[in-house]
Amino acid sequence: MRNCPTGAITKNRFTIEAEKCVTYYNELWGKDEFPDWIKPSAHNCIVGCMRCQNVCPRNREYIHHFMDIESFSEEETTFILEKKEMSNLPEPFIRKLEKANLKMHYNYLSRNLKVLLI
């Protein structure tokens, strides 16, 4: 609970308050900017938020199991930052997004990446 950067996990609830959760704003919130109350330091992933997952005792056995994906080139990172239209992206880059399960998140990767680069 202490590790949640926005206080979305509280002692008196057994659920996560989605309206305070960084993952909600990274993945579902349809606006170009994050709310002012979310500090830039709260962001830690291009999609989602792993702080609660990383410290959860139930995850100890599994937390080190992750998918190693290819790195994005400078050119590919520029595609993301400039929000290049999906229809204009090179096919190998689209396949890389699909392999990393990021294609469905492409529309807001630019916003999410920019806040990580601050």
Report the location of each language-model feature.
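Short amphipathic alpha-helical segments, especially helix-boundary/capping motifs
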Residues: 29-32, 86-92
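Short linker/helix segments within small regulatory modules
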Residues: 33-40
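Long, compositionally biased charged/polar accessory segments in the mid-to-C-terminal portions
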Residues: 89-97, 101-118
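Iron-sulfur cluster-binding cysteine motifs and their immediate structural context
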Residues: 1-30, 42-73
